Regions:
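PAPS-dependent sulfation machinery
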Residues: 66-155, 224, 230
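Short His-Asn-centered micro-motif
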Residues: 41-43, 155-159, 180-182, 282-285
Length: 380
């Protein structure tokens, strides 16, 4: 387990060079009005892992991968070396296994990361923090504070946090809350192809699980109705049992319903992002525009004093267009109308109705792009 140490007395740049300074890095950051870290909120298959890897490459950063992942409940230090990307994941080659940064927080005599609870893995979309949030806050604060004491900048890459983004922003106002945004057609297709080609149901089941566990929230119920989602005919008992029921359900789910469920979760997440994000990372544009990649780098440097390199981003839109013929068991013509319904709903809600706001315009662009890309999909 990590032991507290004295604050760093040297300032280290992104290249690992240090210079003596009587003040701690924490003090310098406060005086410059910069954020004390980054919470990188992303959905599954959004290219969030690639964005996170750009921060992990910096020597001044400690980059935590998915701090709400259920694997952390039972993780042992001996398990970490085997947790490398598979070639089917589409993740970038990593310089170290996924969960390496948690090693100091695992006690030798116990399984699991100190402070983690498996209940953290279920995202929530309630208007106010639930009863268990204070425990989650304490867990993340421990990771954050211990990292700062080591003289590093913490970057957390989440895949289960977008519903709780308002709660996390209230609890951690000192960090920059960045949201990775990808058009829903490409994001869905990435998970659908893994389901079709490799019998991996997780990414298709996840939206049904999130919607089912949150279906009593008024905003969730409304989005389910707008999208016409048919949830699994299973009672919501425990989180694990409902997750298993969802994975069984999607083994025979029709593509139309799977996309509707995914789009519903995307819409809910986008609403949170438009209202709460300090920075929106447009990964569709990132691979198309070197100017945008450079501007994003400068924006991060200005707020957090680190300079990630985004120049190697792939053109994910072109990639999706090239893979359109691989999409089977879903017809783009049958889901064409849902994008119009989604856009109308999003425009009607607070945070997306203001004229010309960056978040609102970007969300609209993503829905228009999704309609264009999905029109090429055919059932057979």
């Amino acid at each position: 387990m990590m032991h507290p140490s004295n604050s760093a007395s040297h300032i280290t740049d992104d290249n690992g060079q240090t210079s003596a300074d009587s003040r701690s890095q924490e003090t310098v950051v406060r005086e410059k009005g910069q954020a004390g870290g980054i919470f990188l909120h992303a959905g599954w298959r959004s290219a969030g892992t690639w964005v996170w890897s750009r921060f992990r490459a910096l020597q001044t950063v400690t980059a935590f991968y998915e701090p709400l992942h259920p694997i952390l409940a039972d993780l042992r230090a001996a398990d970490i070396p085997a947790l490398e990307p598979t070639w089917t994941s589409g993740h970038p080659k990593l310089t170290a296994p996924y969960f390496t940064e948690y090693r100091p927080f695992i006690r030798d005599d116990l399984h699991g990361v100190v402070g983690y609870r498996k209940s953290f893995s279920a995202d929530r979309f309630g208007p106010v923090a639930d009863a268990g949030f204070s425990t989650l806050q304490a867990y993340l604060k421990s990771l954050h504070d211990q990292t700062r004491k080591q003289g590093k900048i913490p970057v957390f890459k989440f895949c289960r946090s977008l519903g709780r983004l308002p709660w996390l922003k209230d609890a951690f106002p000192e960090v920059m809350h960045a949201v990775v945004l990808r058009n829903p057609a490409s994001q869905f297709a990435s998970g659908w192809l893994l389901h079709q080609q490799w019998s991996n149901p997780f990414f298709v089941a996840a939206p049904f699980r999130i919607l089912g566990l949150n279906q009593n929230e008024p905003i969730v119920k409304e989005v389910i109705e707008v999208c016409g989602v048919r949830l699994p005919p299973a009672p919501v008992t425990s989180i694990d049992e409902y997750a298993a029921a969802c994975e069984q359900f999607v083994r025979t789910v029709d593509g139309d319903n799977a996309y509707r469920a995914f789009l519903a979760v995307w819409m809910l997440s986008a609403l949170r992002s438009a209202d709460e994000a300090d920075l929106l990372v447009d990964v569709d544009r990132l691979g198309q525009s070197p100017e945008y990649a450079s501007a994003l780098r400068a924006r991060v440097r200005g707020q957090v004093a680190i300079t990630p390199d985004f120049s190697a981003a792939r053109d994910l839109v072109a990639q999706m267009k090239g893979n359109a013929s691989l999409m089977k068991e879903i017809d783009g013509r049958s889901i064409k109308s849902i994008h119009a319904s989604a856009l109308g709903f999003m425009v009607s809600k607070r945070g997306v109705s203001g004229p010309g706001t960056d978040g609102a315009e970007l969300i609209k662009e993503k829905l228009v792009l999704a309609r264009e890309l999905s029109e090429q999909w055919r059932y057979y």
